[in-house]
C-alpha cells in the first residue's frame, strides 16, 4: 500500500521530482536536531507505520534531497560560467583603458618638454640671483661693520670727559651696527671688535658711575648700549665698588655693633633707590633700567654681607644672628619690586646659615636630655622652681624638654624659615620623653620596684604632654597663623601623641596599683602572726584592732595624699582598687587563720579547759585569736563603709565578721552544755 501511494502522489511532473512532505511517515525536522538519535527516530516512526513504509519514505526523501543538491550544483555552475565570461570582458576593457592612458601620458610629456626645460633654466637663474644678493648683503654688512669700527675708534681716540647725549647716541648707533652683523668675520676683524668694545665699555661704565652719582639723565642710554654689548655686569661691578660701597660703608666702621651697621646700610640702599627714582622720573625709572638698578643695589648688599657681616652670616653669636636676620627679612619683605628680584632677595636671605643657627640653638638641649635620661638621674627637684598655675614637673629630663621647647619657640629664637625644623625638633623631644617614660616604667617594675617613683613618672608623663599642648595653643599656633599655615594637621599630630600618652599612663597606673598592693599585702600579711601572739602566751583577750591594720590604712592614705598632691585625674579609682585588693587579701589570709584555728585548736581547747577549771577562765587562746581577727576585720569594715564601695565589694569582710559572731554563739551554747553536764556529774 505504501508503494502504490508513493507512485500516485510523489511526482508533480516527469522533469521535477517532488514529494508531499506532509504525507511522510516521519518528521524530517528530526534530522536537523543536534541530539538526533537513530533509535529514538525509529521508535517514533514505528508508532505511525511499519518498517517497509518507513524504508520507502526514507528512500523517497533521500532521492528528493539528492535532486535538490543537483539543482543547487547546476545553478552554481551556471553562475560560475556567467561570472567567468564577465571577467574576460572586464579584462579586455582594462587593457584598452591602460593603452589609452599610456598613449595620452606620452603625448602630454612630449607637449610639455619645452616648458620643463624653460622652467629649469628660470630656476637656475633665480638661484644665481639669490646667491648674488646674499653676497651683496654680506659685502654691505662687512662695510657697515668696518665703518662702525672706524667711527668708534675715532670717537674713542679722544673720548670726552663727560659724554653728551649726542655722543652716546652716535656710540649706540655704531655699536648696534657692530652687534647687528650676522656674517662670519676674520680673526683680525674679531680682534678689532673686541678691542673697540672693551674701550667703549670702560668709557660707558665710568660715565655710568658719574651719571648715577649725578642727575642720572644719561643712565638709561648707557644701560641700553651696555645691554647691546652684553656688558651690564661691568657697570654693576663699578657701581658697587666705586659708588655704593665707597659711599655707604666706612672703612673704619665699628665692627662691634654690626646690627647698627646693617641697619644703616639697608636704610642707605632704600634712600639711594628713592633718589634714583626721583631723578630719573617715573617715565624712565621702569622696565629694564629699574630692574638693573635694583639688582645693582641688591648685589651691593650681597657684597657687603660677604665682606663685613661674615661673622653674622655664619652664626657665632646666635642673638646677634637672630636680630640681623629679622632685620634682613623685614628689608626683603618691604622691597618695592620683590616680584622681579625674587632670586636676588632669596640669595640675600640664603647668606644667613639657618642650619648652623638651628643646631647651635638646639644641640645643647638634646645633649642635656640624653644625659638626664639615665635611671641614675631620676630624681625629684625642688618644687619651688615650678611655675605657678602650671602642672608640676619633677624629673630633670621633663623640665629640660619643656624648657627646650619654650626656648626654641620664643620670640628671641624663633625664625619663620626654620619652622619645619623647630616642629621636627619638638616632636623628637616628645617622642624621646615617651620612650624614656616606657623605659623607666619597665625599670621600676623589673629592677627597682619603687611605687613612689612610678607616681612621679606618671605625673611627669601626663603633665608634660598637657604643658606642650597648652603651649602650642598659646604660642606655636599663633606663629603658624602668621605664615598662613593650617594648624589642623599639627593639632592632629599632638592629639595622636596624646592618645599614646593616655595609653601609657593607664599602664603606669596599673603598675602603681600592682606595686603598692604588694607592699600593702606585706603589711596585712601580719594577720598570719596573730596565733603566735595568743597561743600559750596567757595574754588577756584583745579589745581593739591590731597595729598592722592602722599601718595599712595609713599607707593607703599616704598613697591618696601623694596622688592628690600630683593632681592625679584618677586618684579615687586607684585608691578604691588598692583598698579592694587589701580587703580581699585580708579576707583570704584571715579565713586561712580561722580555718587553721578551727582545724587544730579544738583538742587544745578541751585540754586547756580541763587544766584551767579551777581558775574559772572561759576564754581560750583560740577565742582570743578569733576575737583579734574579728576586731581587725571590724575596723577594716568600718573604714570601708566610709568609702565608695558596693555591698558586693564588702561581702568578704562581712563574712569574716559574721563568722566570729556565729562561732561566739556556738561557743556559748557549747560551754553551757558542758557546765550542765559537769553539774549533773
Swiss-Prot record:
Subunit field text: Component of the conserved oligomeric Golgi complex which is composed of eight different subunits and is required for normal Golgi morphology and localization.
Record's bilayer topology term: Peripheral membrane protein
Family: Belongs to the COG2 family.
Gene Ontology CC entries for this record: Golgi membrane; Golgi transport complex
Function: Required for normal Golgi morphology and function.
Alphabetized Pfam families for the sequence: COG2_C (PF12022), COG2_N (PF06148)
Source organism: Caenorhabditis elegans
Keywords: Golgi apparatus, Membrane, Protein transport, Transport
Biological process annotations from GO: Golgi organization; gonad morphogenesis; intra-Golgi vesicle-mediated transport; protein transport; regulation of cell migration
Subcellular location: Golgi apparatus membrane
Taxonomic superkingdom: Eukaryota
Protein name: Conserved oligomeric Golgi complex subunit 2
Amino acid at each position: 500500500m505504501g508503494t502504490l501511494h508513493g507512485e500516485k502522489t510523489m511526482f508533480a511532473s516527469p522533469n521535477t521530482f517532488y514529494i508531499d512532505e506532509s504525507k511522510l511517515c516521519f518528521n524530517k525536522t528530526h534530522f536537523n536536531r543536534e541530539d538526533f538519535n537513530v533509535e529514538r527516530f525509529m521508535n517514533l516512526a514505528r508508532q505511525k507505520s511499519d518498517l517497509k513504509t518507513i524504508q520507502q519514505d526514507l528512500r523517497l526523501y533521500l532521492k528528493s534531497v539528492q535532486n535538490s543538491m543537483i539543482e543547487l550544483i547546476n545553478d552554481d555552475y551556471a553562475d560560475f560560467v556567467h561570472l567567468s565570461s564577465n571577467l574576460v570582458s572586464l579584462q579586455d576593457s582594462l587593457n584598452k583603458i591602460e593603452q589609452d592612458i599610456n598613449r595620452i601620458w606620452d603625448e602630454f610629456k612630449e607637449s610639455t618638454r619645452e616648458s620643463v626645460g624653460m622652467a629649469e633654466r628660470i630656476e637656475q637663474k633665480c638661484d644665481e640671483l639669490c646667491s648674488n644678493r646674499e653676497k651683496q648683503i654680506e659685502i654691505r654688512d662687512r662695510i657697515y661693520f668696518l665703518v662702525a669700527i672706524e667711527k668708534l675708534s675715532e670717537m674713542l681716540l679722544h673720548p670726552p670727559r663727560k659724554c653728551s647725549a649726542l655722543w652716546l647716541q652716535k656710540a649706540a648707533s655704531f655699536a648696534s651696527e657692530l652687534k647687528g652683523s650676522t656674517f662670519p668675520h676674520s680673526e683680525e676683524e674679531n680682534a678689532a671688535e673686541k678691542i673697540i668694545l672693551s674701550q667703549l665699555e670702560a668709557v660707558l661704565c665710568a660715565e655710568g658711575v658719574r651719571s648715577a652719582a649725578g642727575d642720572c639723565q644719561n643712565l638709561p642710554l648707557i644701560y641700553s648700549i651696555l645691554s647691546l654689548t652684553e656688558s651690564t655686569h661691568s657697570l654693576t661691578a663699578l657701581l658697587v665698588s666705586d659708588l655704593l660701597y665707597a659711599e655707604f660703608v666706612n672703612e673704619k666702621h665699628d665692627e662691634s655693633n654690626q646690627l647698627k651697621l646693617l641697619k644703616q646700610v639697608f636704610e642707605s640702599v632704600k634712600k639711594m633707590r628713592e633718589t634714583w627714582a626721583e631723578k630719573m622720573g617715573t617715565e624712565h625709572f621702569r622696565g629694564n633700567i629699574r630692574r638693573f638698578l635694583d639688582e645693582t643695589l641688591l648685589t651691593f648688599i650681597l657684597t657687603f654681607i660677604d665682606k663685613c657681616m661674615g661673622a653674622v652670616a655664619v652664626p657665632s653669636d646666635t642673638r646677634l644672628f637672630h636680630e640681623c636676620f629679622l632685620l634682613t627679612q623685614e628689608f626683603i619683605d618691604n622691597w618695592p619690586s620683590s616680584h622681579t628680584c625674587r632670586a636676588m632677595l632669596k640669595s640675600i636671605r640664603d647668606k644667613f646659615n639657618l642650619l648652623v643657627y638651628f643646631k647651635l640653638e638646639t644641640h645643647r638641649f638634646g645633649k642635656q636630655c640624653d644625659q638626664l635620661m639615665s635611671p641614675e638621674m631620676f630624681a625629684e627637684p625642688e618644687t619651688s622652681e615650678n611655675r605657678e598655675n602650671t602642672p608640676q614637673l619633677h624629673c630633670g629630663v621633663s623640665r629640660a624638654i619643656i624648657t627646650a621647647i619654650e626656648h626654641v619657640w620664643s620670640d628671641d629664637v624663633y625664625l619663620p624659615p626654620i619652622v619645619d625644623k623647630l616642629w621636627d625638633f619638638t616632636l623628637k623631644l616628645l617622642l624621646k620623653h615617651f620612650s624614656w617614660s616606657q623605659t623607666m616604667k619597665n625599670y621600676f617594675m623589673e629592677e627597682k620596684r619603687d611605687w613612689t617613683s612610678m607616681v612621679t613618672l606618671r605625673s611627669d608623663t601626663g603633665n608634660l604632654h598637657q604643658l606642650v599642648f597648652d603651649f602650642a595653643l598659646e604660642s606655636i599656633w599663633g606663629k603658624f597663623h602668621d605664615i598662613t599655615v593650617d594648624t589642623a594637621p599639627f593639632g592632629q599630630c599632638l592629639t595622636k601623641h596624646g592618645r599614646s600618652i593616655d595609653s601609657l599612663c593607664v599602664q603606669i597606673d596599673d603598675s602603681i596599683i600592682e606595686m603598692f598592693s604588694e607592699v600593702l599585702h606585706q603589711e596585712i600579711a601580719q594577720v598570719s602572726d596573730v596565733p603566735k601572739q595568743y597561743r600559750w602566751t596567757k595574754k588577756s583577750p584583745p579589745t581593739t584592732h591590731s597595729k598592722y591594720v592602722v599601718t595599712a590604712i595609713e599607707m593607703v592614705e599616704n598613697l591618696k595624699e601623694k596622688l592628690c598632691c600630683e593632681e592625679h585625674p584618677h586618684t579615687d579609682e586607684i585608691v578604691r582598687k588598692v583598698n579592694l585588693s587589701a580587703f580581699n587579701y585580708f579576707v583570704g589570709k584571715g579565713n586561712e587563720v580561722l580555718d587553721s584555728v578551727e582545724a587544730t585548736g579544738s583538742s587544745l581547747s578541751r585540754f586547756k579547759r580541763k587544766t584551767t577549771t579551777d581558775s574559772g577562765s572561759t576564754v581560750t587562746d583560740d577565742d582570743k585569736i578569733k576575737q583579734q581577727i574579728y576586731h581587725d576585720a571590724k575596723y577594716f569594715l568600718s573604714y570601708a563603709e566610709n568609702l565608695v564601695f558596693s555591698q558586693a565589694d564588702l561581702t568578704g569582710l562581712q563574712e569574716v565578721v559574721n563568722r566570729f559572731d556565729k562561732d561566739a554563739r556556738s561557743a556559748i551554747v557549747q560551754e553551757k552544755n558542758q557546765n550542765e553536764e559537769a553539774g549533773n556529774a
